[in-house]
A protein has these predicted regions:
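Hydrophobic alpha-helical transmembrane segments of polytopic membrane proteins
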Residues: 19, 106-114, 177-188, 260-298
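Membrane-cytosol interface at the C-terminal ends of specific transmembrane alpha-helices
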Residues: 170-210
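An internal, D/E-rich "acidic patch" concept
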Residues: 56-115
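Cytoplasmic-entry segments and transmembrane alpha-helices of multi-pass inner-membrane transporters
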Residues: 2-9, 117-153
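Transmembrane alpha-helix signature in integral membrane proteins
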Residues: 9, 16-17, 21, 89-120, ...
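Hydrophobic alpha-helical transmembrane segments of membrane transport/permease proteins
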Residues: 16-65, 156, 160-173
Length: 313
């Protein structure tokens, strides 16, 4: 396990370096307005002096080296437009908690409803619970997410009597965005578990359990479901982190002061330093999720040996 993790972490660091460096280079191709709050009022001499003080006139390899040197010391620079001269790390620390809270609640909701739904659909293959559940899941997956997000907001805010401006102190404002964020993962868990249970229903270990007189409920819960949880658990950390990262549209829709809305605002206002910091954070979050998934798989099923698996690739 440890050699595999060492290789995985090494590859992850390389991936992180490539992603963030590529974004860093792409941002350097954009207009320089993103580094000045009052660009329209500045003279050319002032602009050049400002770029020089920020090191943006240095050769690109030098700029990349300085960025990573500062990033390794926890310095991601300062915002030039979103909050003038405010440290990027401080802004991220203020915005990240609410996105994580939303992601945790959405993940719990998708697990609480998705797993039982998948179990029921798998046990009732071909009957009305399976057909109804499949129809709902296909609808969720087929309709563009933006469409049902808008409908949920349009009718949900009226039904619950909430306004369009998010109020973190009122639990009612959390219900609609959390439900919206949970739908995609709920559909995935339910359909995946249903398919797994149907595929496993004729395996030898299931037939042996039936021959021993084990009830269908016992087979589903103690045999099939236990095996299904191994690959499912690997997906949970990355799904949670993807929920946090992918909440951009929902946070903007409900005016939630989280990471998603922050990214949209900074891109629209060309705050390049903030965009760099957000991309670095998102890349770290995604990579950590993938590694945690592998670790959880081994903790749940010690029979898994990544060392042998890695060697056979």
């Amino acid at each position: 396990m440890m050699p595999y993790l060492a290789k995985r972490i090494g590859r992850s660091i390389l991936t992180l370096f490539i992603i963030v460096t590529l974004v860093f280079c792409l941002l350097r191709l954009m207009p320089v307005e993103g580094y000045f709050a009052n660009y329209e009022k500045m003279t050319e001499a002032q602009i050049q002096a400002g770029l020089q003080s920020m090191g943006l006139l240095d050769p690109l390899p030098v700029q990349i080296g300085h960025f990573w040197r500062d990033a390794l010391h926890g310095d991601l620079g300062v915002s030039h437009i979103y909050k003038l001269n405010a440290p990027v790390t401080k802004i991220l620390a203020q915005k990240l908690p609410i996105s994580i809270e939303m992601g945790v609640l959405a993940m719990l909701l998708s697990l609480i409803f998705g797993i039982p739904l998948g179990l029921v659909m798998g046990r009732c293959k071909g009957r009305w619970p399976d057909k109804l559940g499949t129809a709902v899941i296909v609808l969720i997956q087929a309709v563009p997410a933006a469409v049902y997000f808008l409908y949920i907001q349009m009718y949900g805010t009226t039904a619950m009597g909430v306004g369009l401006l998010f109020d973190a102190a009122d639990w009612r404002y959390w219900v609609l965005p959390v439900c919206s964020m949970s739908l995609a993962n709920l559909a995935f868990y339910a359909m995946w578990l249903r398919r797994y249970m149907v595929d496993e229903s004729n395996k030898d270990y299931v037939k042996l359990a039936r021959a021993k007189g084990v009830s269908e409920s016992g087979i589903a819960l103690h045999h099939v479901f236990r095996n299904a949880m191994v690959p499912l658990v690997q997906y949970i950390p990355s799904a949670f982190l993807n929920t946090v990262v992918g909440s951009i549209y929902i946070e903007s829709l409900y005016s939630i002061p989280g990471m998603g809305g922050l990214l949209v605002t900074c891109v629209q206002r060309h705050d390049n330093t903030m965009v760099q910091g957000i991309v670095l954070l998102y890349a770290c979050v995604g990579i950590i999720g993938l590694i945690l998934g592998d670790v959880l798989m081994v903790l749940i099923d010690p029979r898994i040996n990544f060392g042998k698996k890695e060697g056979g690739r």
